[in-house]
Structures are given as C-alpha cells and as structure tokens.
Amino acid sequence: MIHETAKIHPAAVVEEGAKIGANVTVGPFTYITSTVEIGEGTEVMSHVVIKGHTKIGKDNRIFPHAVIGEENQDKKYGGEDTTVVIGDRNVIREAVQVHRGTVQDKATTVIGDDNLLCVNAHIAHDVVVGNHTHIGNNAILGGHVTVDDHAGVMALSAIHPFCTVGAYAYVGGCSAVVQDVPAYVLAQGNHATPFGLNLVGLKRNGFEKPEIRALQKAYKEIYRSGKTLEEVKPILAEMAQEWPAVKRFSDILETTERGIIR
C-alpha cells in the first residue's frame, strides 16, 4: 500500500504489497520489494535497494546505492525470513549495507534512532545499533556486534563479531576491536587498546564534573591499579550505588564473553 502523499519516481520499482507511508519520496532506479515497510517522511534517494522483511521508521534519509535487508553473509544462512528494523531520523549515506539477521541469533538486525551511518559502512547480520551513534566511512560491524547509545566507531575501523562497544565509547579510525570496549572509553589501534575516557564526548553530552571524576576513578581501578578484575568488581559495585554512570561502565565486567580491551 502506497500512501497517496508519497512521491514515487516513475523509474523506481516498488513491488505490490510494500507499505510506503505518508510523504515518503523514492528516487529513480530504486528497488523496493513487497515485504518492505517505510514510515512517513522518509527520503529514499536514487539507486537504493531495500529488500526482505525490512521495516524503516519515520524521517530517515537514505542516500544512493545503499543496500538494506539483503541476505547476510553467514554461511549458515539458509534463506530464512529474517528481518531488519530501523528506527527514526537516521542518516544512511552512500553504499551503506545493512544485512538481515540469522535464526541462530534473534533473527533481526536493529538500528535505533538518530544515527549517522557514513559512506560504505557495513552493518552485518544480527548487529544491534542503539541511538545517536556515529559509524564512520568504511567502518565494519561484524555479525552480532552491539554498539550502544552515543558511541562512535570511526572510519576504516572493524569490530570483531560478538563484541560490544559501550555507550559513549569512541573507537578511533583504522582500529581493530577484538574485545569489548566498556562504556565511556576511548579506544584506538590494532588491536585496539584503551587510551582513557572519551572526555570530549562526556562533556558534549552534559556529564557533570563530579560524575566525570567518578568515572575517572573507576577507570583507574580497572586499568591502572594493578588489581585483577575480580578484585576491582566489589570496589566498582560500591561506587555504582552512588554513580549510575559507574554502574554502566562496570556492567560489562559481568556480561562480557570476549573480555574487555586492556
């Protein structure tokens, strides 16, 4: 069903059954399959491919040659009807690829709201991207990766499958991340190592000085005290009772499967 206010270029192909919302625009030579749903106000430019069981929210901008909802590159994939879900107000730049999920995980790839996915970024199967993130040019998020709210993965960086980049963390350009990056941490290199807190990001996002000082103390406990992680956990748990940001920083110690960058 195509809303009466949607504007579909005559050279675009929108299969019967696709749900195209109010005030959506679709540019020439774009291909949208019958199982796609696009929310109101979204702009789909020329030469875009949107396939499969893909649901896209409101007011997104999708630039030329982006491919969303294509079959994933997992060898176990057998053509199952897995999905892509994208929220609102995202900017998806030229040649970005977002692949559908696998039944071996949650069968969906998720992108939240207000994200910037730069040119040729690759979002693999079963990735979960939060809100307000920045994924740089040619960055690669491997299968099952999580990038939490307000995190940044800069140009030409690669995140190993099953890794997490925590909230407000920042992965510098040309980095290879093979373990989890805790929230708020600045990481760089191949393999990526921690270089302190993402202080610029914290200040830009309104963190107060006392909270930043608490995070700096927590960071030193993990990375500079010489203590084991088991020794650090009760110290951080006590700090977390007063500072929610410290809890977010330390939660990954309990959930990590690949370990954290050291």
From Swiss-Prot:
GO molecular function terms attached to this record: acyl-[acyl-carrier-protein]-UDP-N-acetylglucosamine O-acyltransferase activity
InterPro entries associated with the record: Acetyltransf_C, Acetyltransf_C_sf, Hexapep, Lipid_A_LpxA, Trimer_LpxA-like_sf
* Record SUPFAM superfamilies: Trimeric LpxA-like enzymes (SSF51161)
Q: Which cysteine pairs are covalently linked by disulfides here?
A: none
Metabolic or biological pathway: Glycolipid biosynthesis; lipid IV(A) biosynthesis; lipid IV(A) from (3R)-3-hydroxytetradecanoyl-[acyl-carrier-protein] and UDP-N-acetyl-alpha-D-glucosamine: step 1/6
| Enzyme Commission no | 2.3.1.129
Q: Which domain of life is it from?
A: Bacteria
Instruction: Give the enzyme's main class according to its UniProt record, as a single word.
Output: transferase
A single GO CC term for this protein reads: membrane
Gene Ontology biological-process annotations: lipid A biosynthetic process
Task: List localization entries.
Answer: Cytoplasm
Reaction(s) catalyzed by this protein? Answer: a (3R)-hydroxyacyl-[ACP] + UDP-N-acetyl-alpha-D-glucosamine = a UDP-3-O-[(3R)-3-hydroxyacyl]-N-acetyl-alpha-D-glucosamine + holo-[ACP]
**Gene3D superfamilies noted in UniProt:** Hexapeptide repeat proteins, Udp N-acetylglucosamine O-acyltransferase, C-terminal domain
Task: Give the keywords, sorted.
Answer: Acyltransferase, Cytoplasm, Lipid A biosynthesis, Lipid biosynthesis, Lipid metabolism, Repeat, Transferase
Please describe what this protein does.
Answer: Involved in the biosynthesis of lipid A, a phosphorylated glycolipid that anchors the lipopolysaccharide to the outer membrane of the cell.
Q: Which NCBIfam families match?
A: lipid_A_lpxA, PRK05289.1
Family, per the entry? Answer: Belongs to the transferase hexapeptide repeat family. LpxA subfamily.
| Classification via PANTHER family | ACYL-[ACYL-CARRIER-PROTEIN]--UDP-N-ACETYLGLUCOSAMINE O-ACYLTRANSFERASE, ACYL-[ACYL-CARRIER-PROTEIN]--UDP-N-ACETYLGLUCOSAMINE O-ACYLTRANSFERASE, MITOCHONDRIAL-RELATED
This protein's assembly is summarised as: Homotrimer.
Task: Report what the protein is called.
Answer: Acyl-[acyl-carrier-protein]--UDP-N-acetylglucosamine O-acyltransferase
What species does this protein belong to? Vibrio campbellii (strain ATCC BAA-1116)
Gene behind the chain: lpxA
